Amino acid sequence: MFSENLKKCRKQKKLTQQNMADKLGITRPAYTAYELGSREPDYKTLINISNILDVSLDYLLKGESNEKVFQDEAKKVLNDPETFLAAKDGEVTDEILQAALEIITEQLKERRKSDK
C-alpha cells in the first residue's frame, strides 16, 4: 500500500523519482526501491516524504485521507470530550469547548454544501 500511495502522490505533485531523491538526499535507485516496495524508508525519511508530498503519514501508510482521520478524531471527541478537549491541567475550559463547537459547526456547513 505504501509504495502505491507514494508513487501516486509523487505523480500528483508532478515530481520525478530523481526530484524526490534529490529532495530526500538519497540516490534515485534508493528512492525507486521505495516505490517498488523492495525497501522501506526509515521514520525520519518517511516524515520528510510526507512533508514533501504534503500528505499525512496515515495516507501514505494506510491510504486514509486526512478527512477520514479528522472524522475519527471528531468521533473520539464526541464520545469522550473531556479526554480529548482537556487543557494541560485536565480542565475543559469554555474556550476549548467554544473552539470545538466552531470546528464542528464549520464541518457541518461544509458537509451540507457538498450534499446539495
Swiss-Prot record:
Coiled coil: none annotated. One of its GO terms (molecular function) is DNA binding. The keyword DNA-binding applies. PROSITE patterns: HTH_CROC1 (PS50943). Residues 17-36 bind DNA. It comes from the Bacteria. Pfam families: HTH_3. InterPro entries: Cro/C1-type_HTH, Lambda_DNA-bd_dom_sf. Keywords: DNA-binding, Transcription, Transcription regulation. This is Uncharacterized HTH-type transcriptional regulator YqaE. It comes from Bacillus subtilis (strain 168).
